[in-house]
Amino acid sequence: MGRNVSGISQKWDLRYLELAKHISTWSKDPSTKIGSIAIGKNGQVLSQGYNGFPRGVIDSTERLNDREKKLARVVHAEMNVIYNASANGVTLKGSTLYIHGLPCCSDCAKGVIQVGIKRVVMPKKELNDPARLRWEESWNKAKEMFRESGVQWEFI
C-alpha cells in the first residue's frame, strides 16, 4: 500500500477510520452516530469529536428523539474536533480529518477549510443510504468548497 500526499499509508488511513468509528459510538444520538478524529503530520492524534449537544446542554431522550429539537442543538463531529482542539490550544493546520458516519456537510467544510485541515477521509458507504441521501446536496457543496480551497478528500 502506497502513501498519499499527506504521507499517511492506506493501512493507517483504515486504522484511523476505525478509530473514528469507535468514537462515533460515544454519541447519544439514537439515529445517527458520527465520529471524527484529526491526525497530525507525524501520525499523532490531535483531537476527536462526535455528534452531540454542547457541553452543559441537557441531552434528554425527548430532545434526542425529536428531530427538530435535536438539529437545533447538535454539534457535528467535525466541528467538535475543531472546538476541542481550540479549547486545548492545538492547531489543526495541515492535518488529516477522518470522519465515520456521513460525508462532511457544507457547514462543517467551512470550519475544516478555515482551520487549515488539508485532507478529509471518509469510508465508502452505500449510495442509497437514506441518511446519506438527505445530506447529499450539502456534501456536493462541501466538495465544491474543498476543490476551490485545495482541501483533498477521498472515500476509502
Predicted regions located by residue number:
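Zinc-dependent deaminase catalytic domain
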Residues: 1-156
